[in-house]
């Protein structure tokens, strides 16, 4: 089995997802857009994972490869491949499905609470729908949000952002937050994006972010692994 991963910057990698893939028999391949824009044949991909990055999906003039990436993501979705989008990756799914991505009312940066929601569409779904815990803590680093793709089911929200997670059909999940975060990956994004830590209602300090207890990482990893198992069942 092959998991193909779309990476946008060197400091936002797979985190805790990588050992799960290896332990579950996946060969891992990458498109690192900061090095090369080469994408595989859709038919060769068994699982697509789209990671985060500081750019916007709207920055096509500065990053022309975004056009190619959106087309590839749409092809994978249309082909029925399991697709997981994280942060920019969730926004990429929304954009690939024809929806708008735009600045949110607030930036969210740090370890912040998330609430599961009961979307009415969940009740009438003809397929299993993932359920988050009622409340949990996840790592956030975003300033933009998006409109849900048509027929997508909202799964989670925060006080600052309505669309934190969604499921599209049986095999596509988008997460605005990061569940793959490790101590190393948290330190890496803080180091690379420290200038974004401008005090605001939903922005933690560097000290607060890096002082998060181990339980935050373990809980996030547990939910991340549940989602991966759900998508690939």
Q: What is the role of each PLM region?
A:
Residues 1-81, 198-233:
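N-terminal beta1-alpha1 cap of cysteine-dependent amidohydrolase-like domains
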